[in-house]
Amino acid sequence: MTEKEMAKEVGFKYYNYVSTVKNNVLEKKGHLAGPFYYLNFKKISSNRIRRLIIFTMFEKSYSYDFIVRLIKNIESWSFFYPLQESTFNEMMIGIYSTDHQAIIRIFEYLKEEGVLHYYSVYELEDNLLTYNPVFYKMSGKQKEDTHYIDQEIDMEMNFGGCVFDDKDQETMKLSHLDRRLLMYLQSGFLKGELSKIMKHNAKLVDEDGEHPYVWGYNSWRYSYEKLTKNNIISKFYVIYPLPKDICSYFFLILAGTDEETTRKLAAGVGSNCRILRSGGMVRSLNPEDKGKTCWCAHFRSHPLFMHKISSLLEVPEVRTKLIYYCKSISSHGNDSYPVSYMNYYTEQSISLENKYYDRERMEIRYDYDLYYNNIKTLIEKDHLL
């Protein structure tokens, strides 16, 4: 939506007011973030790359800090979200994978060594698609405000789950600049403003004291236009239903009686109210239900909806519902009352540096054997203490 279209929608006479409200009100008050970009993984690497979503439980004798430092040895990590613990500490972890079995081998080792009590692994089909809150709906010609709590699940829709056209999936050879820009755009770094990204890169120094990332603005602009034209990136914003520091956060893994029902549930849960959802279809890699299709989503909502979600899903169509409540982030950035686990709400873009990307083969490769050995060394040292 352009700023002119947004101005017309909200009733502003002058469209330049939109950017003022966006920058000075919505972003500062925690209602708006971005832009971010979806990446077309099939076009940036000729080998298969998917994101794994891994739920973990670990003994309270191991801190969140220790687990995060440990798993960050898997250099293709994507995110860490601490969850509300019960008998065990719990965390949701995302990892970009080119070899699922190699990653499962690492987590199985951690379980055998007693670091993890339990883990479950799901393969994400595509991107986690973001669906922003619905603040009003039409009733005839009248606009009606929506609510923060869904009263029922709309089963009339079907979850599409794909940003990019499956027919256009030819892998593209990416330059060094292309790959750096992709990482910045995916993470929303500097709001994707090319002039700021250019200046930031020009200041970076490598191990030899050189400045290897100096490119002119026209080069950055050309790369951005190439990535856009070739359907490699797609821009989106994140809109929070409440200021983000007072939203409740939780993950939901959901399955219906069959795949079609699961897709209808995925499309319907939270679709007609003020709820922010980022979700995608996943495939279980767990022995007890290997291959089962589910929907996995990260919700940001009013606290009352988080407490109601379980009862909302008490319907005949639901066969599996797993709800993982994230730890509160309401005191994030509050120096007077620091929260020890706050630094472990963290995300990073896919790693496309030279050491991971083979430009001739157009492949992304991660050294999982190295990561396994590094983690094994850390565990052995920990056991000696």
Protein language model annotation of sequence segments:
Residues 1-385:
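A compositional/biophysical signature of low hydrophobicity enriched in polar/charged and small residues
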